[in-house]
């Protein structure tokens, strides 16, 4: 989380959604699981291909990690919805607002299979579907405090 991201967001609910997403990464231990997976794939490929195939090992390992990364992003999105549902204050699909804005600005030019993140359209749909299942999409937490926070940055 950094000041540029806070300035990019439109409201407190979006901020809560993004924070929930980042908390989910920590809670679900995505970074440590990613590192374990990455080093495991590299070692396996090195053993199979021999020591002189470093470039091939690096490329294959990197491509293999993209799917894991997208899965972790999708999982963090879902947990963000669940965390916000537990607050009974914020609309639990707050993170979707961030992706709606990103999609409008064309920030999904990379094909999903080559990206570390799912495309914004998929993320919006998944977040809103989860929110509908939990019945927590239409809560309002409008606050002038968020505008004050943004202007102080």
What are the functions of these language-model segments?
Residues 1-153:
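A Zn2+-metalloprotease active-site environment signal
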């Amino acid at each position: 989380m950094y000041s540029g991201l806070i300035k990019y967001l439109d409201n407190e609910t979006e901020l809560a959604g993004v924070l929930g997403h980042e908390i989910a990464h920590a809670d679900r231990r995505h970074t440590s699981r990613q590192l374990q997976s990455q080093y495991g794939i590299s070692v396996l490929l090195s053993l199979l291909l021999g020591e002189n195939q470093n470039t091939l090992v690096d490329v294959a390992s990197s491509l293999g990690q993209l799917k894991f990364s997208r899965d972790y992003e999708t999982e963090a999105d879902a947990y963000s919805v669940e965390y916000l549902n537990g607050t009974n204050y914020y609309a639990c699909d707050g993170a979707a607002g961030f992706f709606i804005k990103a999609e409008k600005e064309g920030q999904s030019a990379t094909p999903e299979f080559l990206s570390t993140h799912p495309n914004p359209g998929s993320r919006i749909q998944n977040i809103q579907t989860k929110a509908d299942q939990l019945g927590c999409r239409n809560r309002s937490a409008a606050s002038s405090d968020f505008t004050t926070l943004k202007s102080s940055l």
